[in-house]
Design a protein with these regions (language model features):
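C-terminal helix-rich "cap/oligomerization" subdomain common to oxidoreductases
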Residues: 1-17, 50, 87-89, 136, ...
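N-terminal Rossmann-like dinucleotide-binding module
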Residues: 2-67
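Contiguous beta-strand/loop segments that form the cofactor/metal-binding neighborhood of enzyme cores
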Residues: 2-16, 201, 207-299, 346-355
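Beta-loop-alpha module in the N-terminal Rossmann-like domain of NAD(P)-dependent dehydrogenases
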Residues: 67-130
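Rossmann-like NAD(P)(H) cofactor-binding subdomain of soluble oxidoreductases
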Residues: 96, 116, 139-146
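Hydrophobic residues in well-ordered beta-strands that form the structural core
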Residues: 113-114, 138-140, 169, 283
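Rossmann-fold dehydrogenase core element
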Residues: 126-144, 164-168
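Predominantly a Rossmann-like dinucleotide-binding segment in NAD(P)-dependent oxidoreductases
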Residues: 145-229, 385
Length: 390
């Protein structure tokens, strides 16, 4: 059994920006990590970016002056051996997470890994044991906990307005027919490989949100689907079974359905459908053509004007029964959207590292491991065609 040692106090004292090195130069760097860090200059400073060879991916950031003073390093060893680096952000393909994170921890660096933490529960458990034995912080980039729609749902469920939750559907459906220009291997997320399946990518977010709201399920049933026929399960339907609410007289389990379809040809995709004993909640996404939904890219990162603030026409609707009886009338009310705040994850990470207290982490080890266990069981359930116990 691994002995957990206290978190190492920061050299030079608390309160200084955490010097951070980022591995990977894809969209996550330019759209999520760099913009979030830029909003927290008193908490973080990008020290370096690891790019094996110059492929031009950093050019837009350089021209915008967003990488002034940032080192561009060509070997991972340079990052590991640099005593100035305190935190390493692993923003690379899923199958590389374990190797990079293990080396970073062994070099005495705190680590933040893109979801999923790594492809297997065994590897994830080993990484946490290593971090604890070294007195280091290890966390996972579950930024969608800070999405506007999830924060809104979380507050609504906490209010008790809907009564006991009976069932819920949480969806990340899209319509992306296979382009004629498709070539396997161009985009790693569309390249056949077990850890590239949608259940690891979009699924990690949906499962994490369910674990935050309801904890660990008792049973799991799943169907993982290759809807476009490219040799990769890009879609899934996952049922998580939970005991009924403590205040319910029913013995029927609550079922939380998580789904992601890549061929959902609808202008308004369902995001949430929650049914409770006193009312229900329905939330749709805005159509992709809506002006409020600027495409998130290098020109419009997560800090663009209006990001995280959903217009009223996109708010979800709560339907509350006036009386708990057959055929009751309902009140219909729009639920004001909470503001999204992706930098909140980084701010929380700073608090944990700066205070040398991993208990402050919002993304808990137990939750991360639960998410990965659910993913592994979901794949097994799909392969075997049956519901499995957690």
């Amino acid at each position: 059994m691994t002995t957990s040692v206290p978190i190492q106090p920061r050299q030079g004292g608390r309160g200084r920006p955490i010097r951070t090195s980022i591995l990977g130069t894809g969209m996550s760097l330019s759209v999520f990590h760099e913009p979030s860090i830029a909003l927290l200059p008193e908490q973080f400073a990008i020290h370096s970016i690891f790019e094996r060879s110059d492929k031009g991916r950093l050019e837009a950031l350089k021209q915008a002056g967003r990488l002034d003073g940032v080192k561009i390093v060509r070997t991972f060893e340079e990052v590991l051996e640099d005593a100035d680096v305190e935190l390493i952000v692993v923003s690379t393909p899923n199958n590389t997470h374990y190797g990079y994170a293990k080396a970073a921890l062994e070099a005495g660096k705190h680590v933040l890994i893109e979801k999923p933490i790594c492809p297997t529960l065994v590897e994830a458990t080993e990484l946490y044991q290593l971090a604890e034995s070294k007195g280091l912080i290890l966390s996972v980039y579950q930024n969608r906990r800070w999405d506007s729609d999830f924060l809104t749902l979380q507050a609504l469920l906490s209010s008790g307005k809907l009564g006991d939750i009976i069932e819920m559907t949480s969806s990340f459906d899209r319509y992306r027919p296979l382009p004629r220009t498709y070539q396997s291997g161009v985009n790693w997320k569309e390249t056949p490989g077990a850890s590239n399946n949608a259940i690891y990518n979009l699924g990690s977010h949906l499962i994490d949100q369910a674990v935050v709201l309801f904890g660990e399920p008792t049973k799991i049933g799943a169907r993982c689907l290759d809807q476009r026929g490219i040799g990769l399960d890009e879609s899934f339907v996952l049922d998580l079974y939970y005991p009924p609410a403590e205040t319910s007289s029913s013995k029927t389990p609550r079922i939380i359905t998580l789904r992601a379809s890549i061929l959902s040809a609808l202008p308004h995709q369902l995001r949430y459908l929650v049914k409770g004993s006193k009312g229900s909640y329905v939330k749709y996404t805005l159509p992709n053509s809506h002006s409020a939904l600027k495409e998130i890219n290098e020109d419009n990162p997560v800090t663009h004007e209006g990001f995280g603030v959903e217009p009223e026409e996109g708010w979800g609707t709560a339907y509350i029964a006036k009386e708990e009886k057959d055929g009751a009338d309902f009140t219909e009310e729009k639920v004001p959207a909470s503001a999204g705040d992706y930098k909140g994850l980084y701010l929380n990470l700073f608090e944990a590292i700066d205070s040398a207290d991993r208990a402050k982490l919002a993304v808990k080890k137990e939750q991360v491991l639960s998410v990965l266990k659910i993913i592994e069981l979901a794949r097994k359930s799909s392969d075997e065609g049956k519901v499995l116990s957690f």
